Amino acid sequence: MGSRCLFCFADGFKGQRFKWARANNRSGAVLALEAASLLGDRVTKLYLYEPPFIINDSRKPVPADYVQQLNSLTEAGKRSEAVEYFVSEALGIPDEFIGYMKADPSWNKMKDLSHTLAYDGLIMGTTQSGKPLPTNRWVVNAPTLIMTGENSEPLFHDAAQALVKLLPKAAIHTLGGQDHSAVITAPEVLAKTVVDFEL
């Protein structure tokens, strides 16, 4: 979703106020940041789970031509290859595990949706380039809680630390015993945090 489309969407909610609870393993957190920037003070609180920013050498950055390569594979009808490229380059899954993923029935479902993977890349923009986050992309004054899992990879903790420095009313809360899959494996833990944690 481009910024123009997102602005039209956000503009449709004039006069309404929101407490946004957005937990997502990929671009959903960034999309929530974009929406909160556009909606301004109509967003009263914002909750994010592990925005997957790559801002240093904690893992290999996503290639600069990532979106272009995804589109090329999809347009050529190479849907499985597009999913494999996404899993390898964006998610950072080692090659030795991808074969097991292909054997799972969910791989075919991912193939059916492979044409949408480029949208994810467009939303992420340069936030996975291995460079510092842009300082002027988001203007969010709402109290923001950035959640991380205790057992998650360092990149997610580094990303949270970088983002909390950019948002004036942001805080970090680490969920004990959780990792990046908590959105799927422990949604009740995230929900309780959203309900209980006062910003």
Locate each region found by the language model.
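Active-site loop/oxyanion-hole signature of alpha/beta-hydrolase fold enzymes
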Residues: 1-23, 27, 192
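Structured catalytic cores of enzymes that bind and process phosphorylated ligands/cofactors
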Residues: 1-2, 23, 30, 82, ...
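Alpha-helical elements of Rossmann-like donor-binding domains used by nucleotide-donor carbohydrate transfer enzymes
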Residues: 5-11, 69, 81, 85, ...
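Conserved hydrolase catalytic core segment
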Residues: 15-60
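Short, well-ordered alpha-helices that flank and scaffold nucleotide-derived cofactor binding pockets
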Residues: 34-41, 165, 192, 196
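Helix-rich cap/lid subdomain of alpha/beta-hydrolase
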Residues: 51, 55-108, 119-125
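Conserved serine/cysteine hydrolase catalytic core
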Residues: 106-166, 171-177, 182
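Post-His helix in hydrolase/transferase enzymes
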Residues: 159, 183-198
